[in-house]
């Protein structure tokens, strides 16, 4: 009995740790290992408030090519049905080359690696090796039309400004930051205590407010899967009701919906 209890405690602890790690950001090693599925619509949800409908597709940012082909076809179909596509795209936001470089270095100092550019390519040595065999999500493989679709995201400049306001002082760069090439492994001092705020919290609130207040009536959202943990409750607080898919934060019953 003692051994069984010990094993059960270990299993529960493992599951709790896995959940916490997954809740931080979609593109961690555990997220790829545990959530990389072939069907991008398995966790699709539909939210309705009056005559307004939001279709939310929780995305995996690193997957096999076929995954993104399905998303691309779905978005094309929905546009033909009159839906507006809202997509995730974290831009730099700097207005000069010098400012863009500084923002890029500050972002790396927060998240610990160079996010932009060769995300899963061999030349980017800062990207973990386990990501190399996958394809990174981009505008082309998901079929995003930047002229028609809506970029529903903040900029690195806006996020850095919020973090610096929160800590009441600037994020300081050091010689190590300038000496370490962007695509090299990052071993400088960091500000990882602001990782969650940068990757999730501020952007989740931005997306939630945009979806709740937009005048568009038929919307498809493609966004990193873990953003749902804050966006879905915000939609419910905004009186949206789940009409398709599953959500585990609130007991709510509606037609063809299972929640627990």
Task: For the regions a language model picked out, list residue spans one by one.
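Short, solvent-exposed mixed-charge patches
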Residues: 258-260
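Active-site environment of divalent metal-dependent phosphoester hydrolases
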Residues: 63, 229-230
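Alpha-helix capping/helix-boundary segments
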Residues: 91, 227-228
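Positively charged n-region of N-terminal signal peptides that target proteins for export
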Residues: 2-11
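Structured, acidic catalytic/metal-binding patches in enzyme active sites
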Residues: 28-198, 202, 208-216, 222, ...
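Phosphate- and divalent-cation-binding pockets in alpha/beta enzyme and binding domains
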Residues: 210, 230-231
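Bacterial N-terminal signal peptides
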Residues: 15-23
